[in-house]
């Protein structure tokens, strides 16, 4: 039986090298399968417009991205050699979200999915990301590691203060807030496309965690900080209320941490910061695999 192992798109350019090795490659070879790697709309060469103005980004959304894959699978099925082939989708990170959501939206087109490190619940104020990074430092390096990082933060803050006092005496690199905004305002960049998706569907804003972590100096890393970028890079209408409503819509549409899917393997690691938005998926008809770091 021919199994089509489909590596699914994420917020990046596709590359043939991903089809030449790894566990999916081995599974495809063992089952005489055929691997296909598709590219997400608005990334790599899969772009409908020459530039990414806010108006031109209106077709960048999860619903149409899923429909792209549905159309592609149907087209492949028109070929006699693939007509009766079951389809398995594989994805990691954001692509893991997409394979789970595809299984939910188009169950008749895919037999099963393998989702690795997928943050399937959208969240605006995502303090859990940096909290998990702190716990990973603590778990892998102990208190000594934490102390080293904290000791490094203090002189860096002092240097930053000194530079601020002498900024008018010399020419510095353009590290202003406006320069950061410009990064997401470039008409053709994956950074702009992905940030648009976070503003309009997912959130994932990695905000400052609770007091007592190595990230205490990042108190400025707030929801307001990220939303301000949304407004300045795209549109003033992308305010905090808009972002929260947009993320809630996606969670409502796909079930958040409890998607209605079957024949799914969900994989997360305990020091993976994204597990915070995906580990509770161990529900009916879903196999959850929890990978613990080695002491």
PLM features per residue range, with description:
Residues 1-70, 74-79, 240-263, 273, ...:
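N-terminal cap/lid subdomain of alpha/beta-hydrolase-fold enzymes
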Residues 4-7, 34-38, 88-90, 112-115, ...:
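Structural recognition of the beta-strand scaffold that forms the well-ordered cores
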Residues 11-13, 41-43, 94-95, 120-121, ...:
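Conserved beta-strand elements of beta-rich interaction domains across eukaryotes
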Residues 31, 106-109:
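Short, structured coil segments at secondary-structure junctions
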Residues 81-93, 98:
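Alpha/beta-hydrolase fold nucleophile elbow
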Residues 101-105:
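Active-site signature of alpha/beta-hydrolase-fold catalytic machinery across serine-
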Residues 108-153:
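A catalytic-pocket lid/entrance helix-loop region that shapes and gates access to the active site
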Residues 151-295:
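C-terminal subdomain of alpha/beta-hydrolase-fold enzymes, centered on the catalytic histidine
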